[in-house]
Amino acid sequence: VSRQQAEKRGRQAERIAAWWLRLKGWQIVGRRMRTPAGEVDLVARRGSMLAFVEVKVRGSAAELDIAIDERRLARVAAAAEILWHDLAKAGDDMRIDVILLAPGRAPRHLANVWHGG
């Protein structure tokens, strides 16, 4: 898969993940938010919860189990801490989520996957 194809597939996965979150009552407040620490694919809000979401797409469901690692989550968490100051309101909570996508499968939303490292 070329870098351009991977980029296109990633953007499509992010659109699907955003749609999935909206169906679950979340409001998308940011997409592909870059910081010096890294990038967050989606930022979503539901009530007082801000979720910083990493989206992963793989060619098969079996590949999803190894799609995310601690190093990647640490970068998302570091970027989330930077973005938090601009996006959070008084009383908000935050968490790091992952949405896993594979052909023929419903999106798998893993909530609150990061607890520091």
Segments from the language model and where they lie:
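Active-site metal-binding core of divalent-cation-utilizing nuclease and nuclease-like domains
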Residues: 23-50
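Short, charged, amphipathic alpha-helix that recurs within catalytic cores of restriction-modification
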Residues: 67-87
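Conserved catalytic cores of phosphodiester-cleaving nucleases, focusing on short active-site segments
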Residues: 40-63, 68, 76
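Structural motif
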Residues: 37, 50-52, 93, 107
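Acidic-basic catalytic patches of nuclease active cores, encompassing PD-(D/E)XK
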Residues: 1-31
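Residues forming the ATP-binding cleft of Hanks-type serine/threonine protein kinase domains
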Residues: 33, 56, 113-114
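Domain-level recognition of nuclease-like catalytic cores that cleave nucleotide substrates
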Residues: 86-117
